Amino acid sequence: MFNMENTAKEEKNSQPLLDLEQDMQDHDRAQELKASVQDKVHKLHALLREGSDKESFGQQQSLLAGYVALQKVLGRINRKMI
């Protein structure tokens, strides 16, 4: 009614893309990012299994949580782009 449907679609499509979303549109760059994050997650898992002092253990856990969150964000961006 009153052409409101079209303006809502235009506003949704006119939102600027974030840097990460732009990188994810390039297929090669997206694969590179995913592989890099996956590699870092595997390395952190290995370091946590080996064990270390409490301070570095806490830092490694924080890093691991951050990279896992980044993996989730990358997955959601992929689903959004499709």
Swiss-Prot record:
InterPro entries per record: DUF5398
Source organism, top-level taxon: Bacteria
Pfam families to which the protein is assigned, alphabetical: DUF5398 (PF17376)
Family: Belongs to the chlamydial CPn_0711/CT_665/TC_0036 family.
The name this protein goes by in its record: Uncharacterized protein CPn_0711/CP_0035/CPj0711/CpB0738
Organism name: Chlamydia pneumoniae (Chlamydophila pneumoniae)
Organism placement in taxonomy: Bacteria, Pseudomonadati, Chlamydiota, Chlamydiia, Chlamydiales
